[in-house]
Design a protein with these regions (language model features):
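Short, surface-exposed loop or secondary-structure junction motifs
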Residues: 2-5, 114-338
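Short active-site loop at a secondary-structure junction
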Residues: 31-44, 63-123, 175-186, 264-267
Length: 392
């Protein structure tokens, strides 16, 4: 299978990395493609601040034989939450709020029990107690925030402005605040609204101006440019039609409903592995990249520090008595992983992963679109093990 190689800064051996493990990585991806587990793969690996690998193989479309490219653009899904987290941390650094600021100080819908004990920290660590994403638990789907919003909108009499925040939390809490880790994307949507209200600026514009643009992430955005559309992974016919319209310069139908007012800060960004590796290296450099300061060193250290203690996790069949989680970042450890203690990461549905190891100064980002549409560990956990096996 042909492997297309992108631009690198140096050979792997120049940073103390065994290049034969890159070949092992390609072989692993080829096996997964042959088994129809993934359509293709694209990845970027950085070691000691230098890009040592950027390559792609397999298909860059779910509906054609178009080849995956080293600069393929894709939806990064929940990796978006890291950008939302950084934006929130910037506002904390600027003195507007603190991690333990009650959400009710910004969103009055949280002023009454049982919501009044929820802080920004709880939203950032998935411990607010709000009902989690659908699929986390068999019984959670009826209480999903999006379903609650939709149901409330159908009953809305049209007077005033529809309160999607109130509707989204109308199911109450599944667990007491701070008592259990439950993956909650809606919490990051709420953080997006909070960022907008604190900054006085649309949160999408804020993230682009304060995080994405200073990092010179030219292929990253909530909106899809013509150039991005030309290189977008095509997941279905409807997606192809949308990309074709963007390429042709045709205006997309504007969504003027209340849905368009809800922030896309839980999973709305598109990017490339090369752009995301710049974000990873900013974190490894304690908030700075190429002379541009995004965050201060102490804030990066706080984000990458284990936050939870004896807080259990039962999502998706887990049975962890002590969930390892930072601020915005997953810090999971266990037999599935070989990265260093203190590594922080995040997955994106569909699937993608960004893994950052401060001890080894190693970062990796990869996109592996599911072929059959079902999550499995081989394109994620196994890939991490192969990449980290190259350290000399």
């Amino acid at each position: 299978m042909e492997v297309l190689k992108g631009k690198v800064d140096c050979l792997p051996e120049e940073t103390g990395y065994d290049s034969s493990r890159i070949e092992a990585l390609n072989a692993h991806f080829e096996r997964l493609i042959d088994k129809e587990i993934i359509h293709g793969a694209v990845y970027t690996i950085s070691h000691k601040g230098k890009i040592i690998a950027n390559a792609s193989l397999g298909r860059g479309s779910a509906i054609s034989q178009a080849q995956m490219q080293p600069d393929t653009v894709f939806p990064i899904a929940s990796i978006t939450k890291l950008f939302t987290t950084v934006a929130m941390m910037q506002l904390i650094e600027d003195g507007y709020v603190r991690l333990n600021t009650p959400v009710a100080e910004i969103l009055p819908q949280f002023a009454e029990p049982p919501f009044n004990g929820i802080t920004l920290w709880h939203l950032l660590t998935h411990t607010s107690g709000l009902y989690p994403d659908g699929g986390c638990f068999p019984e959670s789907a009826p209480m999903n925030s999006w379903g609650l919003i939709d149901a409330a909108y159908r009953l809305w009499n049209g007077e005033g402005e529809f309160d999607w925040v109130k509707a989204g939390i109308s199911g109450g809490l599944r667990r007491p605040v701070g008592s259990e880790w439950q993956y909650n994307s809606f919490g990051f949507v709420l953080l997006g609204e909070i960022i907008s209200r604190i900054s006085g600026q649309d949160v999408h514009d804020y993230i682009m101006q304060k995080v994405v643009n200073p990092l010179v992430m030219q292929d990253t955005g909530f909106a899809i440019t013509q150039d991005m559309a030309r290189r977008m992974f095509i997941r279905n016919e409807q997606w192809k039609e949308m990309m074709d319209a963007i390429i042709a310069g045709k205006p997309l139908q504007r969504d003027n409903s209340f849905w368009s007012k809800i922030p896309s800060t839980g999973g709305g960004l598109h990017s490339t592995t090369n752009d995301l590796i710049r974000f990873a290296n900013m974190m490894l450099n304690y908030g700075c990249l190429d002379g541009n300061r995004i965050l201060g060193r102490k804030m990066v250290e706080r984000m990458a520090t284990q936050q939870l203690h004896n807080v259990p996790d039962y999502c998706w069949g887990a049975n962890e008595p002590n969930r390892l989680y930072g601020i915005g970042f997953d810090m999971r450890q266990g037999l599935d992983y070989t990265y260093s203690q203190g590594t922080y990461m995040h997955e994106g549905a569909g699937a993608s992963s960004i893994d950052i190891d401060p001890k080894e100064q190693l970062a990796a980002v990869w996109f592996v679109p599911w072929d059959k549409g079902e999550w499995c560990p081989d394109p994620l956990y196994n890939v991490q093990n192969i990449i980290w096996s190259g350290l000399l």
